[in-house]
């Protein structure tokens, strides 16, 4: 093989190997940052992993908010109309957090079925609902009830449909 061709081949192979390594590292980093969304029904049915960070969303059950007297610990229940999941959070809740409103919590699911959230996102206006929560309510057949309650002036959602 001609020395010039051999040198070109080595350079091309080095470039291909470098690009391959860069793509591999990028895909690995992206995979670690993926937070899949799970509904309370999926979490209650055991479909959500307990060892990775997930997003869970739904409507905050009326009367479920429990605040600690001596710390920033908060517990509340989120529902999609079919099942419920308890969320534990340490920190200051967003200003727009209210019972009966849609939220998305990011955290890890404990072995006891409680989602330990490190971030809670509240919807930003009265009519907005996260797309994942809307889909979960639609799938459980509770979206129309929620919308009818909002049209009638209700400010909260309960599972019995009253």
UniProtKB/Swiss-Prot annotation:
Residues 1-8 are cytoplasmic. Residues 139-148 have a biased composition (Basic and acidic residues). It is found in: Cell inner membrane. It is a single-pass type II membrane protein. The chain crosses the membrane at residues 9-29. GO terms for biological process: cytochrome complex assembly. Residues 139-162 are annotated as: Disordered. Keywords: Cell inner membrane, Cell membrane, Cytochrome c-type biogenesis, Heme, Iron, Membrane, Metal-binding, Signal-anchor, Transmembrane, Transmembrane helix. SUPFAM superfamilies: Heme chaperone CcmE (SSF82093). GO terms for molecular function: heme binding; metal ion binding. Heme binds at residues 124, 128. Pfam families: CcmE (PF03100). NCBIfam families: PRK13254.1-1, PRK13254.1-3, PRK13254.1-5. Belongs to the CcmE/CycJ family. Heme chaperone required for the biogenesis of c-type cytochromes. Transiently binds heme delivered by CcmC and transfers the heme to apo-cytochromes in a process facilitated by CcmF and CcmH. HAMAP family: CcmE. This is Cytochrome c-type biogenesis protein CcmE.
